[in-house]
Amino acid sequence: METNAARDRIFARIRAAQGRGPAVTEGEREAVADYLARHPQGPQPPVDGDRAAGFIAQAQKMASTVDRVATLSEVPAAVVRYVDGLKLVRHAVAWTSLGSLPWAEQGMTVECRPPLRDPQGDHDHGDLVGITGCFVAIAETGSLMLLSGPDTFASAALLPETHIAVVPVSRIVANLEEAFAQMRAEHGRLPRATNIISGPSRTGDIEQTIVLGAHGPYRVHVILVDQG
Protein backbone atom coordinates (compact mmCIF):
# COMPACT_ATOMS: atom_id res chain seq x y z
CA MET A 1 0.00 0.00 0.00
CA GLU A 2 1.35 3.43 -0.97
CA THR A 3 1.20 5.25 2.35
CA ASN A 4 1.38 8.80 0.98
CA ALA A 5 -1.64 8.14 -1.26
CA ALA A 6 -3.54 6.62 1.67
CA ARG A 7 -2.78 9.68 3.78
CA ASP A 8 -3.99 11.99 1.02
CA ARG A 9 -7.27 10.06 0.78
CA ILE A 10 -7.82 10.31 4.54
CA PHE A 11 -7.15 14.05 4.53
CA ALA A 12 -9.46 14.50 1.54
CA ARG A 13 -12.31 12.80 3.42
CA ILE A 14 -11.72 15.01 6.45
CA ARG A 15 -11.75 18.13 4.27
CA ALA A 16 -14.93 16.96 2.55
CA ALA A 17 -16.63 16.56 5.95
CA GLN A 18 -15.64 20.16 6.68
CA GLY A 19 -17.16 21.34 3.42
CA ARG A 20 -13.83 22.09 1.77
CA GLY A 21 -12.26 20.88 -1.46
CA PRO A 22 -10.01 17.80 -1.57
CA ALA A 23 -6.75 19.74 -2.03
CA VAL A 24 -5.17 22.44 0.11
CA THR A 25 -5.45 25.82 -1.58
CA GLU A 26 -2.65 28.34 -1.91
CA GLY A 27 -4.65 30.72 0.26
CA GLU A 28 -4.79 28.15 3.06
CA ARG A 29 -1.05 27.59 2.84
CA GLU A 30 -0.42 31.34 2.98
CA ALA A 31 -2.68 31.67 6.02
CA VAL A 32 -0.72 28.98 7.88
CA ALA A 33 2.61 30.54 6.89
CA ASP A 34 1.38 33.94 8.07
CA TYR A 35 0.24 32.47 11.40
CA LEU A 36 3.57 30.76 11.96
CA ALA A 37 5.46 33.94 11.10
CA ARG A 38 3.41 36.04 13.54
CA HIS A 39 2.97 33.50 16.32
CA PRO A 40 5.34 34.43 19.17
CA GLN A 41 7.77 31.79 20.37
CA GLY A 42 8.04 31.02 24.04
CA PRO A 43 11.19 31.71 26.04
CA GLN A 44 14.22 29.84 24.77
CA PRO A 45 17.07 28.63 26.99
CA PRO A 46 20.46 30.01 25.95
CA VAL A 47 22.62 27.85 23.68
CA ASP A 48 26.38 28.35 23.85
CA GLY A 49 28.11 29.71 20.79
CA ASP A 50 29.67 26.32 20.03
CA ARG A 51 26.60 24.35 19.00
CA ALA A 52 28.60 21.18 18.41
CA ALA A 53 29.89 21.21 21.99
CA GLY A 54 26.39 21.88 23.28
CA PHE A 55 24.96 19.03 21.21
CA ILE A 56 27.65 16.60 22.41
CA ALA A 57 27.03 17.44 26.06
CA GLN A 58 23.27 16.98 25.77
CA ALA A 59 23.52 13.84 23.61
CA GLN A 60 25.76 12.18 26.18
CA LYS A 61 23.26 13.06 28.91
CA MET A 62 20.70 11.10 26.88
CA ALA A 63 23.02 8.03 26.81
CA SER A 64 24.13 8.54 23.21
CA THR A 65 27.81 8.16 22.42
CA VAL A 66 29.59 10.63 20.15
CA ASP A 67 32.64 10.51 17.90
CA ARG A 68 33.95 13.26 15.64
CA VAL A 69 35.83 13.12 12.34
CA ALA A 70 37.08 15.73 9.91
CA THR A 71 35.55 14.47 6.65
CA LEU A 72 32.92 12.05 5.38
CA SER A 73 35.62 9.75 4.01
CA GLU A 74 36.68 9.06 7.61
CA VAL A 75 33.23 7.83 8.64
CA PRO A 76 33.74 4.14 7.69
CA ALA A 77 36.87 3.90 9.86
CA ALA A 78 34.99 5.53 12.74
CA VAL A 79 32.12 3.05 12.34
CA VAL A 80 34.53 0.09 12.35
CA ARG A 81 36.23 1.39 15.50
CA TYR A 82 32.86 1.61 17.20
CA VAL A 83 31.48 -1.79 16.19
CA ASP A 84 34.78 -3.54 16.88
CA GLY A 85 34.99 -1.92 20.30
CA LEU A 86 31.62 -3.45 21.21
CA LYS A 87 32.31 -6.72 19.36
CA LEU A 88 29.41 -6.07 16.99
CA VAL A 89 29.08 -7.38 13.45
CA ARG A 90 30.82 -5.56 10.61
CA HIS A 91 27.62 -5.55 8.62
CA ALA A 92 25.02 -2.80 8.43
CA VAL A 93 22.15 -1.37 6.42
CA ALA A 94 22.35 2.31 5.52
CA TRP A 95 20.66 5.18 3.77
CA THR A 96 21.37 5.49 0.06
CA SER A 97 23.33 8.73 0.49
CA LEU A 98 25.96 6.89 2.53
CA GLY A 99 26.48 3.99 0.13
CA SER A 100 29.35 5.60 -1.80
CA LEU A 101 31.62 5.91 1.24
CA PRO A 102 34.70 3.60 1.25
CA TRP A 103 33.21 0.90 3.46
CA ALA A 104 34.94 -2.06 1.84
CA GLU A 105 38.36 -0.49 2.40
CA GLN A 106 37.67 -0.75 6.13
CA GLY A 107 36.33 -4.30 5.96
CA MET A 108 32.74 -3.18 6.52
CA THR A 109 29.80 -4.58 4.54
CA VAL A 110 27.04 -2.00 4.05
CA GLU A 111 23.81 -2.53 2.10
CA CYS A 112 21.64 0.45 1.17
CA ARG A 113 18.19 -0.92 1.94
CA PRO A 114 15.67 -1.02 4.79
CA PRO A 115 16.45 -3.54 7.54
CA LEU A 116 14.95 -7.02 7.33
CA ARG A 117 13.31 -8.99 10.09
CA ASP A 118 14.47 -12.55 10.69
CA PRO A 119 12.35 -14.59 13.14
CA GLN A 120 15.38 -16.81 13.78
CA GLY A 121 17.75 -13.88 14.31
CA ASP A 122 18.82 -12.18 17.51
CA HIS A 123 15.98 -10.13 19.02
CA ASP A 124 13.86 -10.82 15.91
CA HIS A 125 16.10 -8.65 13.74
CA GLY A 126 18.04 -9.89 10.77
CA ASP A 127 19.98 -6.60 10.58
CA LEU A 128 21.60 -5.51 13.84
CA VAL A 129 23.25 -2.22 12.80
CA GLY A 130 21.58 0.67 10.97
CA ILE A 131 23.47 3.71 9.67
CA THR A 132 21.60 6.91 8.83
CA GLY A 133 22.15 10.58 8.31
CA CYS A 134 19.77 13.11 9.80
CA PHE A 135 17.91 16.22 8.68
CA VAL A 136 19.26 18.29 11.57
CA ALA A 137 20.66 17.72 15.05
CA ILE A 138 19.33 19.80 17.95
CA ALA A 139 21.88 21.31 20.33
CA GLU A 140 19.41 22.14 23.10
CA THR A 141 18.34 18.53 23.64
CA GLY A 142 21.02 16.40 21.97
CA SER A 143 18.36 15.03 19.63
CA LEU A 144 18.34 13.95 15.99
CA MET A 145 15.55 14.90 13.59
CA LEU A 146 15.00 12.37 10.80
CA LEU A 147 12.58 12.88 7.90
CA SER A 148 11.25 9.76 6.20
CA GLY A 149 11.50 9.26 2.47
CA PRO A 150 12.29 6.60 -0.16
CA ASP A 151 16.04 6.91 0.51
CA THR A 152 15.81 8.03 4.16
CA PHE A 153 13.77 5.14 5.54
CA ALA A 154 13.02 5.55 9.24
CA SER A 155 13.30 1.80 9.85
CA ALA A 156 17.11 1.97 9.67
CA ALA A 157 17.05 4.05 12.85
CA LEU A 158 14.31 2.12 14.63
CA LEU A 159 14.62 -1.63 13.98
CA PRO A 160 18.34 -2.52 14.35
CA GLU A 161 19.56 -2.77 17.93
CA THR A 162 22.39 -0.32 17.14
CA HIS A 163 21.73 3.01 15.39
CA ILE A 164 24.69 4.98 14.05
CA ALA A 165 23.92 8.51 12.82
CA VAL A 166 26.24 10.54 10.60
CA VAL A 167 25.74 14.24 11.35
CA PRO A 168 27.50 17.14 9.59
CA VAL A 169 28.34 19.83 12.14
CA SER A 170 26.78 22.36 9.75
CA ARG A 171 23.39 20.67 10.33
CA ILE A 172 23.30 21.36 14.08
CA VAL A 173 20.57 23.87 14.98
CA ALA A 174 19.91 25.57 18.30
CA ASN A 175 16.49 24.19 19.20
CA LEU A 176 13.37 22.38 18.02
CA GLU A 177 11.73 25.58 16.79
CA GLU A 178 14.69 26.24 14.51
CA ALA A 179 14.58 22.63 13.31
CA PHE A 180 10.94 22.91 12.21
CA ALA A 181 11.57 26.33 10.64
CA GLN A 182 14.39 24.80 8.59
CA MET A 183 12.13 21.92 7.58
CA ARG A 184 9.52 24.35 6.28
CA ALA A 185 12.16 26.39 4.47
CA GLU A 186 13.80 23.40 2.76
CA HIS A 187 10.84 21.07 2.20
CA GLY A 188 7.69 23.17 2.39
CA ARG A 189 5.58 20.36 3.80
CA LEU A 190 5.86 17.61 6.37
CA PRO A 191 7.05 14.18 5.24
CA ARG A 192 5.11 11.01 6.01
CA ALA A 193 6.99 10.68 9.31
CA THR A 194 9.24 12.93 11.37
CA ASN A 195 11.27 11.19 14.08
CA ILE A 196 12.96 13.00 16.96
CA ILE A 197 15.54 10.64 18.47
CA SER A 198 16.96 11.44 21.90
CA GLY A 199 19.28 8.60 22.83
CA PRO A 200 18.49 4.88 22.94
CA SER A 201 14.96 3.55 23.31
CA ARG A 202 13.98 3.19 26.95
CA THR A 203 11.04 2.37 29.18
CA GLY A 204 10.30 2.34 32.90
CA ASP A 205 7.01 0.45 32.70
CA ILE A 206 8.04 -2.38 35.03
CA GLU A 207 8.67 -1.28 38.62
CA GLN A 208 9.87 2.11 37.30
CA THR A 209 13.19 0.51 36.36
CA ILE A 210 14.69 2.04 33.23
CA VAL A 211 15.40 -0.57 30.54
CA LEU A 212 17.19 0.36 27.32
CA GLY A 213 16.25 -1.10 23.95
CA ALA A 214 12.69 -2.02 24.87
CA HIS A 215 11.03 -0.45 21.82
CA GLY A 216 13.97 0.37 19.57
CA PRO A 217 17.77 0.55 19.52
CA TYR A 218 19.87 -0.31 22.57
CA ARG A 219 22.53 2.11 21.37
CA VAL A 220 22.66 5.42 19.54
CA HIS A 221 26.10 6.46 18.32
CA VAL A 222 26.57 9.83 16.61
CA ILE A 223 29.49 10.57 14.30
CA LEU A 224 29.91 14.32 13.84
CA VAL A 225 31.56 15.37 10.59
CA ASP A 226 33.32 18.74 10.54
CA GLN A 227 33.30 19.03 6.73
CA GLY A 228 30.07 17.21 5.88
Can you say where each PLM-predicted feature lies in the sequence?
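The feature marks the mature, well-folded catalytic cores of soluble enzymes
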Residues: 1-228
